[in-house]
Regions:
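A glycine-rich dinucleotide-binding beta-alpha-beta segment and adjacent secondary-structure elements
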Residues: 54-66, 283-347
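Active-site-proximal substrate-binding core of FAD-dependent oxidoreductases
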Residues: 125, 366-379
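C-terminal segments that line or cap access tunnels to active or ligand-binding sites in enzymes
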Residues: 191-298
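Single conserved hydrophobic/aromatic residue that forms the stacking wall/gate
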Residues: 1-13
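Active-site-adjacent segment of FAD-dependent monooxygenases/related oxidoreductases
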Residues: 27-70
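Mid-domain catalytic core of redox enzymes
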Residues: 91, 121-235
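Helical element adjacent to the flavin cofactor pocket in flavoenzyme catalytic cores
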Residues: 79-130
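A conserved FAD-binding loop/helix module that cradles the flavin
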Residues: 343-364
Length: 379
């Protein structure tokens, strides 16, 4: 068992290290990476190198981090994300919003300005380039370069120009999406729930796979439970979250309604799902209910309305070995000064946001310059 696990670890490390983006070693191309591991599924590779069936399931126990699907998600996605988490900090003290705050502070320090509560309603183009963005259907903000981290489908909806070919729009609109999520955000009673410095992945069946395929009776088939890292050293958690897969179809009837105004039936639906998820958590952590002061929830509709991600998906576009290049979204567009970034152009989740940013910025500053700056900042 030990040698099998080591084989999986070494294979993941080799694939991650072969990428100049993940290793921050500049190379003209990542030819070794464009091989079988982008074309073979996670389960196919693991079943090949892991002989113990229980160990094979353990190694993919954190599937909710990237919503992998059996026979579809490439092993390279698993390798990059696992290597990223193995090498990085696993929690952000005080919550992840501190990352956004630090980014805003940096932008301000360099003379930039961050505008909030101003919705971009159109990317304005002339015959050859993007010339600015329209905000709230009125104000025009001139731009030399436009970078969009919105879902690619949302970005295309902002473009009324012949510079984007209909074939490209059709291809982007037909890329499958990852599954949505139902979250229960927990507020614990003070000094009641011991802080967990790890994520907990719970499953009601004997496999982490196929949790996105459920019925009303079988939901939830799996869940992720974690505590948010407190700002001060304390043995107790103040907040946490439970996350389980949820298809957009479950909340489709309320699509088009406004947040906070979806009606009592929607509130009853969320409460029923939350209570069921809490019942499952109680089975894994007996007594946890007594430590919860209150909770609130989110559904795929929440993701759709607040982030614009298609279908309320957690991680945007799905990676599918069956699609090949048709399932990839480039950072460049046919509009020379319009770029895409974020989790849809490279990888999923937090890793996708980080590497998507590097890939897009490399178009403006070169990859070599970006890698050198990152390395210097880490010295």
């Amino acid at each position: 068992m030990r040698s099998s696990a080591a084989s999986d670890v070494y294979k993941r490390q080799d694939i991650a290290n072969a990428s100049s983006l993940h290793s921050l070693r500049y190379a003209d191309s990542d030819a070794p990476l464009n091989t079988e591991y982008q074309l073979r599924s996670i389960n196919a590779v693991i079943d090949e190198v892991i002989t113990d069936p229980v160990l094979a399931k353990v190694l993919v126990g954190n599937l909710p981090l990237y919503a992998a699907e059996k026979d579809k998600t490439p092993f390279s996605t698993h390798a990059f994300i696992m290597d990223f988490y193995n090498q990085s900090a696993f929690r952000v003290r005080g919550g992840s919003d501190s990352i956004a705050t630090a980014l805003v502070d940096t932008i301000n320090r360099y003379g930039g300005e961050v505008l909030t509560r101003q919705k971009v309603t159109r990317i304005v183009c002339d015959d050859t380039h993007a010339v600015g963005v329209e905000v709230d259907g009125g104000e025009m903000l001139p731009c030399d370069i436009v970078i969009s981290d919105a879902h690619p489908m949302r970005t295309l909806e902002l473009l009324d120009t012949r510079l984007i070919r209909p074939a490209f729009r059709r291809r982007i609109n037909h890329i499958p999406q990852t599954v949505g999520g139902f979250s229960v955000y927990l507020h614990f009673k003070e000094n009641t729930v011991p802080y967990l410095n790890y994520n907990y992945y719970g499953y009601q069946g004997d496999t982490p796979w196929d949790c996105e395929r459920y019925t009303e009776q079988s939901w939830p088939k799996g869940f992720l439970y974690m505590h948010f890292c407190p700002e001060t050293d304390t043995p107790y958690a103040s907040t946490g979250v439970i996350l389980s897969y949820m298809q957009m179809a479950d909340v489709e009837q309320w699509k088009g309604t406004a947040p906070g105004r979806r009606g009592q039936a929607y509130e009853d639906f969320k409460r029923r799902k939350a209570e069921r998820l809490l019942d499952v958590l109680e089975e894994h952590f007996p007594g946890i209910r007594s430590g919860i002061q209150n909770y609130y929830t989110s559904t795929p509709l929440t993701y759709l309305d607040y982030t614009g991600t298609e279908g309320g998906s957690m991680y945007g576009n799905a990676r599918d070995i069956g699609l090949g290049s048709a399932g990839r979204v480039p950072q460049r567009t046919r509009i020379p000064n319009l770029y895409l970034t974020g989790q849809n152009i490279n990888s999923h989740g937090m890793l996708g946001v980080l590497v998507g940013t590097v890939v897009t910025c490399s178009e403006l500053l070169t990859a070599k310059t970006i890698y050198e700056q990152i390395k210097k900042a880490g010295e």
